[in-house]
Amino acid sequence: PAICKFTGFSYPMRGKSLSFYRGKITIKMEYTKDFFEKVFSADRMKKYFLLYPGDEAKAIKHYQCNIMLSEAMYPCLSVFEVELRNSVVRELVAFAKREDWYVVFSTTPGLMELNKYISTAKKQIAARGEDITTAKITAELTWGFWTSLFNRNYERILWKDLRRAFPFVKKANRQRKVVASFLNKFRRLRNRIDHNEAICWNLDEVEMIHDEMMNVMGWMNKEVPTWLSQFDRFSSVSLDIRKIMNW
């Protein structure tokens, strides 16, 4: 193995060459199918190698592009989740007429089932030895909870208030089922990314979801998409992937 020495540290590197660039060392490594199957499991990698029989290099590139695409979605996902949560909480406070809005779930017919999310959040906070506050409960609740508020089961009770969380939505889209459809689509993509699942199989679809998410952000606040676009790298990463994969 080659020995890489840098800033007082030595460690073995199994690679083909070392090169220097602006004071940094770039290690050019050879990674094979065996490496990826060992690190990420043969089952996870199977779909990639089956897609490119006889071309391990392209299969590996595809897997790496999946990681790149997942990483590039995080700014949009994280901003959307926080914006949605805060917009919805504002309307739930108005609905409940109290800051600890979740308290009314346990006594409101039709909403009692939602109390299970609140109980779970409280248990998780208590398990960390922290004080249970409204802010911490709000932060602890999952995307699944926020999305569930737009289910058909709660339309009669909640929709007339929750629709005000989207003051800039066009009239044609000002329907619970439209909002719920988008939120569930975003949640499914987010869950796949969080569980390191494949999302880079239909790049057109992921690009569409990213655009839809930016659009729905604008339904809540017109300025958020403009602000996020200043540092969101999704479009450039997506373009890079198309070049890498020759798509």
Please identify what each model-predicted range represents:
Residues 1-181, 185, 203-247:
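Extended intrinsically disordered or low-complexity regions, especially N/C-terminal cytosolic tails and loops
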Residues 196-204:
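Inter-helical turn/loop segments and adjacent helix faces that build the functional surface
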